[in-house]
């Protein structure tokens, strides 16, 4: 696959990571460069940051700290219940449970690799796997809990480096009529608003609709609805 490098934003430290010292020694920096993939039409970081450097037991961002996000997830949960009436739901990147907690009346499973956050949802009696989302994990979850009517993921899929495996794992965990709901930054909106700050270590990709179609069709998934949100 041919890649065209087109933007170099220099060296940056890890985000969402508070360090113990004012001037820590050997702080990790990465080269923030962007690439365009000619076949898939994906925009990605030229070099990915190792996931465990970003997502670990010191991860700082908690979605429920924002009143706006708390209300947005509560509203979205109501919308999903009304439209799809799921009997089971899986969230990839469940953070501190701000979304998945609204589905306590059905089978609700979280996947969250940051242990400090996974511990929070476990205390909320939400079964949470403190693992990175992979095909192997999807098989393990299927074996124990069955497949799901809805799989939801907000601001997480763009963080995962192996996209083909990611979507195959999602397809593997959905019921025949199941729905996957993805919420991530839009390349179009980022360009229209000159939001270059959407490009950083966690955002391995920033998706266009064309790129998403090219990736999801490999896994047997089909895009049937697109909405623009104001929360990211």
What are the roles of these predicted feature ranges?
Residues 164-181:
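A short glycine-rich, Lys/Arg-flanked "PGG" loop and its adjoining helix->strand segment in the class I
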Residues 96-106:
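Conserved SAM-binding loop of SAM-dependent methyltransferases across substrates and taxa
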Residues 182-205, 209-210:
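Short, glycine-/aromatic-enriched active-site segment of Class I SAM-dependent methyltransferases
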Residues 124-140:
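Conserved SAM-binding strand-loop segment of SAM-dependent methyltransferases
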Residues 85-95:
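Conserved class I S-adenosyl-L-methionine
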Residues 1-67, 227-228:
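N-terminal juxtadomain amphipathic helix
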Residues 107-112:
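Conserved SAM-binding motif I beta-strand of class I
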Residues 152:
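A conserved beta-strand element that flanks and buttresses the S-adenosyl-L-methionine
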């Amino acid at each position: 696959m041919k890649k065209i490098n087109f933007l170099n934003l220099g060296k940056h430290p890890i985000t969402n990571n508070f360090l113990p010292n004012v001037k820590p020694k050997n702080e990790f920096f990465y080269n923030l460069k962007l690439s365009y993939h000619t076949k898939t039409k994906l925009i990605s970081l030229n070099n990915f940051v190792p996931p465990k450097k970003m997502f670990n037991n010191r991860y700082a961002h908690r979605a429920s700290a924002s009143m706006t996000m708390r209300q947005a997830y509560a509203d979205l949960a109501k919308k999903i219940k009304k439209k799809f009436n799921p009997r089971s739901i899986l969230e990839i990147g469940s953070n501190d449970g701000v979304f998945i907690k609204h589905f306590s009346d059905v089978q609700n499973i979280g996947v969250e690799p940051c242990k400090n956050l996974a511990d929070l949802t476990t205390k909320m009696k939400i079964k949470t796997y403190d693992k990175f989302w992979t095909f192997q994990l999807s098989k393990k979850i299927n074996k124990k809990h069955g497949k799901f009517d809805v799989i939801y993921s907000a601001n997480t899929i763009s963080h995962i480096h192996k996209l083909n495996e990611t979507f195959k794992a999602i397809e593997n965990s959905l019921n025949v009529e199941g729905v996957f709901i993805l919420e991530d930054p839009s390349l179009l909106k980022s360009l229209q608003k000159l939001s270059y700050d959407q490009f950083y270590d966690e955002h391995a990709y920033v998706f266009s609709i064309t790129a998403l179609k090219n990736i999801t069709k490999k896994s047997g998934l089909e895009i049937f609805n697109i909405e623009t949100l104001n929360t990211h």
